[in-house]
Amino acid sequence: MKAKELREKSIEELNTELLNLLREQFNLRMQAASGQLQQSHLLKQVRRDVARVKTLLNEKAGA
């Protein structure tokens, strides 16, 4: 997910995206803990996407 795509979204859409990413992160962590996760790079990717969304939410809240 690109930051440029996220900047075009509203605050409500960003909050929805954040919830979806957190759910996905939880599911990936559970798969990793049970040894079922084949693509371990997804954990890092989702964690960074969460950070991008949170950063944009903070920027929009300050503006």
From Swiss-Prot:
The keyword Ribosomal protein applies. It comes from Shigella flexneri. One of its GO terms (cellular component) is cytosolic large ribosomal subunit. One of its GO terms (biological process) is translation. This is Large ribosomal subunit protein uL29. It comes from the Bacteria. CDD domains: Ribosomal_L29_HIP. NCBIfam families: L29. One of its GO terms (molecular function) is structural constituent of ribosome. Belongs to the universal ribosomal protein uL29 family. Keywords: Ribonucleoprotein, Ribosomal protein.
